[in-house]
Amino acid sequence: MTTDTTGRTGNPAAAASPERFRYGFLKGNPQLTKNGELKHLLSIEGLPRSIVNHILDTAEQFVSVTDREVKKVPLLRGKSVFNLFFENSTRTRTTFEIAATRLSADVLNLNINASSTSKGESLLDTINNLSAMHADLFVVRHASSGAPYLIAEHCAPHVHVINAGDGRHAHPTQGLLDMYTIRHYKRDFTKLRVAIVGDILHSRVARSDIHALTTLGVPEVRAIGPRTLLPGGLEQMGVKVFHNLDEGLKGVDVIIMLRLQNERMSGALLPSAQEYFKTWGLTPERLALAAPDAIVMHPGPMNRGVEIDSQVADGPQSVILNQVTFGIAVRMAVMGIVAGNND
């Protein structure tokens, strides 16, 4: 038995088989206070629809802030936000930093490679030391599923935690910004058919999107991909599974494309990228199978010529760059809700 960076023995992701959709460390709902208010954002799973809608409604208000000449509000003035990214990130880290700055927070980006964790310090010891510096909010991305839960469980009572992606488990702010994007273009969730396409097995975004879509009442969620890249447990959540892209895309209103997460694959699950594109790539011809006003989304990073054709990515039905723009407002909303009150 080994000791990992969290300070615990064993594998931090061992609570769940990678083939299953749900994770075993979700006990109760540690992200809510006794009064049902949001203290941490760790997962969309288990969040009441009212809280999800409250976040989306609050984000709507912050969209106008991003369009102003002075793009700041004083909601987190005097608060310290620590961005702790133990995995690489461009969009998520940058938009969290922009969001915190626009809320007037003091922002610190921890250089993980130069931190004491690279010298063997456990994750919890790192968190305890940063808490002693009077941190108010930790934004955490970690390769181990459940790491943000561990931090939320052991951090000081006044500290809030936002999960910016943990292993294969969850990426709740991406899920929320995806829901905001869908609501912006489609308005009524209860009349939609949404397809998620690609490497769903390794995708924390897919898990968060599926939980969010079902919470918001989407009547038909489709998971489309090779058998080797689809987790078990999807049908039990009411998700329709397709192993043929053309069949799965027929009549859908929203298409969410996912990249191949080769860094999380332990074996040869697929042929070459070229062969993958022939079978699973979203081309203009395949997009034509969807509803005429369907929108195309992608959480990024995007691999052109692998899961999506450039004509689609840059075409009139693509809202991919708008997702990034909306992500700032959504992350402002999340940080404002969890840490904006006087603790």
From Swiss-Prot:
Q: Which SUPFAM superfamilies match?
A: Aspartate/ornithine carbamoyltransferase
Q: What keyword terms does UniProt attach to this protein? A: Pyrimidine biosynthesis, Transferase
What are the protein's GO molecular function terms? amino acid binding; aspartate carbamoyltransferase activity
What is one process in the GO biological process aspect for this record? Answer: 'de novo' pyrimidine nucleobase biosynthetic process
Q: Which GO terms describe its cellular component?
A: cytosol
Q: Does the keyword Transcription regulation apply?
A: no
Q: Provide the reaction this enzyme catalyses.
A: carbamoyl phosphate + L-aspartate = N-carbamoyl-L-aspartate + phosphate + H(+)
Q: In which pathway does it act?
A: Pyrimidine metabolism; UMP biosynthesis via de novo pathway; (S)-dihydroorotate from bicarbonate: step 2/3
What this protein is reported to do is described as:
Catalyzes the condensation of carbamoyl phosphate and aspartate to form carbamoyl aspartate and inorganic phosphate, the committed step in the de novo pyrimidine nucleotide biosynthesis pathway.
This chain belongs to the protein called: Aspartate carbamoyltransferase catalytic subunit
Q: Which organism is it from?
A: Burkholderia multivorans (strain ATCC 17616 / 249)
Q: Report which gene this protein is encoded by.
A: pyrB
